[in-house]
Each structure stands twice: as structure tokens, then as C-alpha cells.
């Protein structure tokens, strides 16, 4: 309003001054220009008034309504996506990004319902044994056995078949199903595979354990040899998304890992593949990896949590919070409804040892000690899991 009055006053005084010095023809022209200027100013003034009313209407009515509707949509969308998954559908990346910001309690409750729909009360437990450790050729920045770690890790060659069988018999005394043999290095040599195969055959003969192996980037022929010895599943983590992988490791590639998984499936083996979380990745990286795993149709998905170890490049990283871990677990259950979501390394630093994850979509775990760090007691794990209503398969 003040702007319009100022313009009108300026035009009027200018007009009076010019007319006092102009001819009649020029005066008529100036008067016309004057009214045109007044018309333009009046139009702008009216437009400003309209815009002001629109802003007031948006702030007082539209914005509060949008906020209310969004809250309703969020609640309904979690349930809609849950129903979609339970009915056999698959969520999209956009759906997953939406869920990554949804209410955590509602998300975990829905994930638990999805898990029980597809698996009932079945729970899978795995134990690991380090059959060859130390002197790893790879430069994974999170690992204490890596070439870039400044930690004295005792190295040992491939253990004998006899010692392997003794370890397996001890594990067989517990109520566990899978027994995973893990080796350091980029890949196990053909000589070591021949050596370990005799031990695998003995385990299959003398125990009820299902043998898994984590022997690195093997080829289809090597996987077939392991399958003939009795191996049912191989482990090969993608670790993170394709985008972020070069920040974690440069001594081998993401494509090599995917090729290994494809080769194992061609050999008739199940695949256990997941990643490590809390290494600087974004939520989008976590989601991208989950969708890659879904495309690869893996059987089991380990969720490893970075346990910062002094002497590694990530030794000063802050561990993920319990809430972040619950969100990852629940989100993975939505994306991977028919896979075992396996809480793995890093459980020991959680206040409840990660048991709350077993009510948020996870239905499998690795128990006992890990490769280079202490884990959760097998007896404690099995007892608590059964008390939660699960049946260990």
C-alpha cells in the first residue's frame, strides 16, 4: 500500500512539473503515459494483495492440513507396505527410503509380523571356526587381519582335518545348525581345499552339522568340489553398496564378489551374503546393498556391526546406536522377506546383546566367538532365544 502511494505521488508531481514546461501535444502524450504508469502500478499492487492472501491461506490452512495428512499417510503406508510384502509383493527403493524415516516402533512391529509370516517361530543359529588366520593379502579397512591393520594377529596355516573334526564335535553338543569354516585371504588354494575337504566329509559323517565355508573368491569348479564334500552353503559378503565399496577395499572388486556368488549358485550351493554397517556408509548405501542381495537371491543375510578396533583405519569410529541397528534390521526384513536376516559380528557391544533385533525382523544369528573378537556365549544365546518363543532349527 505504501509502495503504491509513493508511486502515485511520484507520478503526479512529475506530471505537474513536465506539463508546466511542455507543449499541448507533448502534454497529451505525457498524460497518456501517466495513466499507463498508474495502471501498471495498480495492477502490481493488486497482485501483491492476492499473493499476500494466498500466503496467509497456505500458512493458516493448507500447511497444517498437509502435516496432518502426512502423519496419517506415514502410519498407513507402513501397514500398506507390510501387507504388500506379506501378500507376496516386493517394495521399491523409494518405499525403502520412505521406511528408513518412518516411526521406528511401527517399523519394527511390522517387520516382526513379516518375519513370522514367512518363517513362523523358526530360528537359525550358526557358529564359526577360523580354519586359517592372519597374513591376509587384502586391505579391508575394518578388519584386524587386513594388510592395513597395525595389530599383531597370530597367523596359522590351514588346520588339519583331525583338529577340524574335534572342533565340530564340540559345536555339535550345542543346539546349532550351521557350522561355518572361515579362512583369511583373497581365496583358498586348491591344495588347501583338497586338505579341508577330507575334514568336511568327516564332519558330515560324524555330526548333524550343516557345513558352510567362507573361503574367498573361488570359482565354480572349486565350489563343486566343496559341494561334493558335503558343503551346503558358502559365505561371501558384499560388505556395502557398489558405490561405497572402494572406500572399504581396493585389493579386490565388487564385481569379483558378485561373480563369486553367481558361481556358487551355479554349483548348486546356497549363499550367505550381507555386509558390515557403521563404516561410514549412508542409508542409501545400505538400501542399495539390500536390493543387490535381493537380485542375487541369496539365502541368508548377515548384519555385521563395526566393532572399532584400535590399530585399524576405523579404530576411532563411533559404534552405531541401538536404534540405528533396529532400523537396519527391520528395513532389511521389508526388502528381503524370505531371507534369513542374521545378526552377526558386533552384537557384544549392544546393551541387550542384540536380542531386541529378534523382535524387529531378524531370525538368525552367529553365536560364540567371532574370528578375532569374543562373541556371545552359545548356551546364553540358545536359552534366551528359546525363551523368546523361537524354535531353533
What is the predicted function of each stretch?
Residues 148-167, 171-261, 270-274, 299-304, ...:
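Core AdoMet radical
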Residues 3-6:
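Tryptophan (W) side chains
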Residues 214-219, 276-290:
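Active-site glycine- and acidic-residue-rich loops that bind
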Residues 193-201, 229-235, 283-299, 353-367:
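Short, electropositive alpha-helical surface patch
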Residues 66, 70, 74-102, 294-393:
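Auxiliary Fe-S-binding modules of radical SAM enzymes
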Residues 141, 145-148:
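Short functional micro-motifs and their immediate structural scaffolds
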Residues 17, 50-138:
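Flexible, acidic/Gly-rich N-terminal and inter-domain linker regions that tether
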Amino acid at each position: 500500500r505504501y509502495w503504491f502511494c509513493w508511486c502515485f505521488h511520484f507520478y503526479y508531481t512529475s506530471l505537474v512539473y513536465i506539463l508546466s514546461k511542455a507543449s499541448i501535444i507533448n502534454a497529451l502524450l505525457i498524460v497518456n503515459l501517466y495513466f499507463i504508469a498508474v495502471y501498471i502500478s495498480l495492477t502490481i499492487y493488486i497482485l501483491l494483495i492476492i499473493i499476500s492472501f494466498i500466503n496467509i491461506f497456505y500458512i493458516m490452512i493448507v500447511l497444517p492440513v498437509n502435516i496432518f495428512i502426512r502423519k496419517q499417510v506415514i502410519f498407513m503406508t507402513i501397514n500398506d507396505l507390510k501387507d504388500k510384502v506379506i501378500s507376496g509383493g516386493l517394495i521399491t527403493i523409494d518405499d525403502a527410503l520412505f521406511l528408513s524415516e518412518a516411526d521406528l516402533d511401527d517399523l519394527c512391529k511390522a517387520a516382526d509380523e513379516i518375519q513370522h509370516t514367512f518363517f513362523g517361530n523358526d530360528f537359525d543359529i550358526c557358529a564359526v571356526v577360523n580354519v586359517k588366520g592372519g597374513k591376509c593379502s587384502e586391505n579391508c579397512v575394518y578388519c584386524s587381519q587386513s594388510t592395513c591393520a597395525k595389530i599383531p594377529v597370530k597367523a596359522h596355516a590351514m588346520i588339519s582335518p583331525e583338529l577340524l573334526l574335534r572342533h565340530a564335535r564340540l559345536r555339535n553338543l550345542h543346539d546349532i545348525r550351521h557350522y561355518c569354516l572361515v579362512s583369511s585371504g583373497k581365496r583358498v588354494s586348491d591344495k588347501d581345499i583338497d586338505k579341508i575337504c577330507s575334514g568336511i566329509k568327516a564332519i558330515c559323517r560324524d555330526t548333524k552339522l550343516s557345513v558352510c565355508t567362507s573361503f574367498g573368491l573361488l570359482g565354480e569348479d572349486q565350489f563343486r568340489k566343496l559341494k561334493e564334500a558335503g558343503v551346503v552353503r558358502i559365505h561371501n559378503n558384499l560388505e556395502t553398496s557398489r558405490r561405497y565399496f572402494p572406500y572399504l577395499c581396493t585389493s579386490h572388486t565388487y564385481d569379483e564378489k558378485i561373480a563369486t556368488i553367481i558361481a556358487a549358485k551355479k554349483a548348486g550351493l546356497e549363499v550367505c551374503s550381507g555386509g558390515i554397517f557403521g563404516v561410514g556408509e549412508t542409508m542409501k548405501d545400505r538400501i542399495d546393498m539390500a536390493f543387490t542381495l535381493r537380485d542375487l537371491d541369496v539365502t541368508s543375510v548377515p548384519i555385521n556391526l563395526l566393532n572399532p578396533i584400535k590399530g585399524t583405519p576405523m579404530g576411532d569410529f563411533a559404534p552405531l546406536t541401538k536404534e540405528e541397528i533396529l532400523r537396519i534390521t527391520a528395513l532389511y526384513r521389508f526388502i528381503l522377506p524370505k531371507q534369513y536376516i542374521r545378526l552377526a559380528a558386533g552384537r557384544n557391544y549392544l546393551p541387550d546383546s542384540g536380542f531386541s533385533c529378534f523382535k524387529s525382523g531378524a531370525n538368525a544369528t552367529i553365536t560364540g566367538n567371532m574370528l578375532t573378537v569374543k562373541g556371545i556365549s552359545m548356551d546364553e544365546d540358545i536359552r534366551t532365544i528359546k525363551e523368546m518363543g523361537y524354535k531353533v532349527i
